[in-house]
Amino acid sequence: RYGIHLASVFRSGDFVPHVRMPATGKESTSLASLFGLPYVLTSKQRNFDKKTLTYNWQINGTDAFSVYSGETDNIDVNLARKAVSAVLRFLTRMGILKYNCHNGYIASIIEEEDLVSVKASAPGFLRRFVTINEEVNRGQLLGEVINPYNGEILSEIRSTADGIIFY
């Protein structure tokens, strides 16, 4: 049994399309890789996870996956198509239906606690210099926080690690 949850609405902002699974001890990252999305993200259990659909599916013997398309604040037709293709790709690979599509990505498996949060030191308008899924180096300028009243730069935001912009 498989449970596929299209969950993008629960995370605000833009992010790399990925499959997310709570680490219950019953998760299967190898099955999650069959969606062909660039990343499979596992996360340690938090108190509220016990009330989520995917957690309860997994605990009760269903292979459960949350598919995050990459956009929540707007309708992005291209990202929606990629999410639909990922689900159809998975169902085809599991022998449930036949659908012709490209192979997708070889997924990188990452754990949520390996993601590094970068925060601004001041409030204001954000001027981004990098985009989602862009590779960055430690110390690289990611953006600036601008004073909304006079346009002055209040703060610079720099990468604290080498990697990609995930969220």
Regions found by a protein language model. Give the residues of each.
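Structured catalytic-domain cores with a bias toward divalent-metal coordination
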Residues: R1-Y167
